[in-house]
């Protein structure tokens, strides 16, 4: 069972959006990227995502000003250049699909051109920050009230706990040429071997356990298959990377005390600083219906929230049919528009990175970045 994190709403001291101090020093880009990865590992990102350093000026490149934005539009790029940014941290990756050419034809190509011409690097964390324990989804959960949270889809550790991806085990009695077997498997690269005495069917035997890579597994099996009796006793286990506590996509939040849906709506509006949001009432639900469990996912949460049992789904956007499906099950759905469930995190990020980077560089927030959709 996964451990849970207890979320208590807190007031965070806000730094001005444009901090500029001549006492700040520079950081080498590579050193800064290493620190950013220490803050939230890019290994947390989804496999389909495009994260990390997307645009790099010719080295050496030093950073005095880090510019934070949710979306890097041409308007935001102009602001970043005016404020002398050396590195733009854009939550959403401005380069996602492969580019076949870099011309002045499209706005995303123009972003790359302007960045390189002005020696500005571009970095995107995206789903790595969604999954991180101190990331976007945890920030979104702060607006619900005091609650216990856990990831809906926990992340896996980047590495296996032991060498190899598979474990192969077999038992051999002393009448078999065990020394020959052990010598052969130890000679295969990518294999670690342990052995210990074991009693099987009333007979003293030796239990052999091998951790192997996929490639080594096939080599070991090819050797063991030469001994029919030994091969038939061989067990193969596929190893899994361990789950990471408090890290993963979405959050399932259990409130310490139930509140009405109407109260929850006001809390979310206040947290996201929104005058309006979109609501789909679950079948049989009203604004006075109690809310105890909230499943949330910043951005587009349809796939993450699908099938999760909760009183309320909170996300930026979902497809029409996903909303209908949730409502039919009595689940209320609140949609706030995609980036409105993400952008507010940047203020917390500004302060957290300031501490993490020991205030070595200027960290400023975009003032022109905004959700493209408006209620009219």
Swiss-Prot record:
Q: Which residues carry this modification: N6-acetyllysine?
A: 108
Q: Which residues carry this modification: Phosphoserine?
A: 258
Which residues does the record list as Phosphothreonine (modified residue)?
254
Which GO MF terms are attached to this record? Answer: identical protein binding; RNA polymerase II-specific DNA-binding transcription factor binding
Q: Entry's Pfam families?
A: DUF34_NIF3
Q: Which keywords does UniProt give here? A: Acetylation, Cytoplasm, Nucleus, Phosphoprotein
Q: Does the keyword Acetylation apply?
A: yes
Query: What coarse category fits the chief subcellular location reported for this protein?
Result: cytoplasm
- Gene Ontology annotations for the cellular component aspect, listed alphabetically: cytoplasm; mitochondrion; nucleus
**Subcellular locations according to the entry:** Cytoplasm; Nucleus
Q: Where is this region: Mediates interaction with COPS2?
A: 243-376
Q: GO biological process: what's one of them?
A: neuron differentiation
Q: Acetylation as a keyword?
A: yes
The organism sits in which domain of life? Eukaryota
Q: What does this protein do?
A: May function as a transcriptional corepressor through its interaction with COPS2, negatively regulating the expression of genes involved in neuronal differentiation.
Q: Which family does it belong to?
A: Belongs to the GTP cyclohydrolase I type 2/NIF3 family.
Tell me, how does this one assemble?
A: Homodimer. Interacts with COPS2. Interacts with THOC7.
* Protein name as annotated: NIF3-like protein 1
What does UniProt list as this organism's lineage?
Eukaryota, Metazoa, Chordata, Craniata, Vertebrata
């Amino acid at each position: 069972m996964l451990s849970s994190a207890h979320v208590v709403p807190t007031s965070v001291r806000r730094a001005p959006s444009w901090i500029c101090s001549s006492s700040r020093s520079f950081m080498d880009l590579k050193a800064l990227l290493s620190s950013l990865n220490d803050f939230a590992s890019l290994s947390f990102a989804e496999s389909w995502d495009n994260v990390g350093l997307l645009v790099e000026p010719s080295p050496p490149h030093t950073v005095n000003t880090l510019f934070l934005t949710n979306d890097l539009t041409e308007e935001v790029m102009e602001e970043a250049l005016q404020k002398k940014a050396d590195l733009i941290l854009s939550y959403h990756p401005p380069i996602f699909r492969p580019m076949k050419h870099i011309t002045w034809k499209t706005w995303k190509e123009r972003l790359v051109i302007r960045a390189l011409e002005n020696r500005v690097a571009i970095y995107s964390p995206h789903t790595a920050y969604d999954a991180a324990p101190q990331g976007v989804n945890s920030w979104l959960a702060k607006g619900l009230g005091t609650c216990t949270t856990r990831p809906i889809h926990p992340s896996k550790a980047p590495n296996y706990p032991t060498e190899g991806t598979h474990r192969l085990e077999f038992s051999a009695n002393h009448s078999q040429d065990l020394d020959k077997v052990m010598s052969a498997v130890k000679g295969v690269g990518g294999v670690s071997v342990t052995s210990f005495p074991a009693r099987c069917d009333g007979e003293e035997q030796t239990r052999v356990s091998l951790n192997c890579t996929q490639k080594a597994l096939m080599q070991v099996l090819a050797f063991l298959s030469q001994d029919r009796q030994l091969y038939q006793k061989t067990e193969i286990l596929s190893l899994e990377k361990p789950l990471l506590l408090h890290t993963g996509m979405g959050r399932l939040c259990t409130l310490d005390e139930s509140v009405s849906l109407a109260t929850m709506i006001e809390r979310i509006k206040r947290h996201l600083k929104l005058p309006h949001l979109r609501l789909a009432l679950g079948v049989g639900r009203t604004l006075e219906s109690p809310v105890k469990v909230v499943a949330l996912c910043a951005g587009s949460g349809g796939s993450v929230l699908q099938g999760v049992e909760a009183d309320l789904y909170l996300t930026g956007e979902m497809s029409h049919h996903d909303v209908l499906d949730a409502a039919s099950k009595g689940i209320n759905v609140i949609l706030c528009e995609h980036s409105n469930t993400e952008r507010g995190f940047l203020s917390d990020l500004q302060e957290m990175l300031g501490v993490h980077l020991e205030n070595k560089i200027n960290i400023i927030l975009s003032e022109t970045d905004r959700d493209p959709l408006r209620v009219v």
